[in-house]
Amino acid sequence: MKIGIKVGNLFDQSGHLVIGFSDTFDTEIGDVVSKDSMQGQFLVSMYSNNQNKLDTELDALLQNEESEEDATKTRGKNKRYKIGTVVALSGQERKFFCCAYSRMGSDLKATSDINNLWMSLQNLWNKIRVEGEQKTIVMPVIGTNLARVPGISFKLPINLILLSYIINSRVEPISKEMILVIRKEDQEKVNLLEIQDFLKTLHN
């Protein structure tokens, strides 16, 4: 089990990618999904901004997942899936693990909490065990919306991801390596030395 921390662009990395989604798996760039969000960048970088192609592939994988329609959500998609739903899209020589960890409100604001993030990570690791073939996993810091809650720092989702990965890897291997990528614009919000120290305590 190897863990790496990098600052940079998620989509420049090699390996399977983890992409955080809301429970509606919205993909429409604009008012529904920001072009600067991870979902927006994923659509542009990995699907050449072909929303129909991405939606078709997502729908095919989600058709057997439990869902319910929400008539109050009139913009974007209105079919909701359980928090923690994970599907694996197939790319060229790698997969994209799409994990629903937040709830998209009718006001188009995505919210989550610690319990939902933790549960979603559990499901994510299980899916990667089955379909990841023990290859390197590259993921962003999902759950950064938790940092908007007063009293909660940006490092909380980072620590949760690292803790969850290590605990679950000890139960059963997930991948040969997990690389956590921090966006350049978020670099000032974290202390990389503190993260390394936290990792050391987890390995002890």
Label for each model-derived stretch:
Residues 1-204:
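Macrodomain-like recognition of ADP-ribose-binding/processing modules
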